Amino acid sequence: MQNDAGQTVELYVPRKCSSSNRIIGPKDHAAVQIDFVDVDPETGRMIPGKSTRYAICGALRRMGESDDAILRLAQKDGLVPRDELKSN
């Protein structure tokens, strides 16, 4: 498709699930995208460029695996310590 300036633009940019690497289709309305950001402790505002984005497909959400997938990804990226949520 072309815009008014004659440049070719895409209407849909496909995403991949961060956990399963499945392509998230345009009709997957159950898919979510979550951004975790670093916050300045003094101002309470987001620090630009310091964010981590995860996309979770609807299939994982339907199976009830999205919380485990996000926790595993956050632990891999160092957002959550590996032993943080282990029960005794």
Swiss-Prot record:
GO cellular component terms given for this protein: cytosolic small ribosomal subunit; rough endoplasmic reticulum
Entry-linked Gene3D superfamilies: 3.30.1230.20
Subcellular location: Cytoplasm, Cytosol; Cytoplasm; Rough endoplasmic reticulum
Pfam families, per database record: Ribosomal_S21e
Name the record gives this protein: Small ribosomal subunit protein eS21
PANTHER family registered for this protein in UniProt: 40S RIBOSOMAL PROTEIN S21
Assembly description: Component of the 40S small ribosomal subunit.
Similarity remark: Belongs to the eukaryotic ribosomal protein eS21 family.
UniProt keyword list: Cytoplasm, Endoplasmic reticulum, Ribonucleoprotein, Ribosomal protein
Chain ranges passing through the membrane: none
Origin species: Caenorhabditis briggsae
InterPro entries (UniProt xref): Ribosomal_eS21 (IPR001931), Ribosomal_eS21_CS (IPR018279), Ribosomal_eS21_sf (IPR038579)
Taxonomic placement: Eukaryota, Metazoa, Ecdysozoa, Nematoda, Chromadorea
MF GO annotations: structural constituent of ribosome
GO BP term, example: endonucleolytic cleavage to generate mature 3'-end of SSU-rRNA from (SSU-rRNA, 5.8S rRNA, LSU-rRNA)
Major location category of this protein: cytoplasm
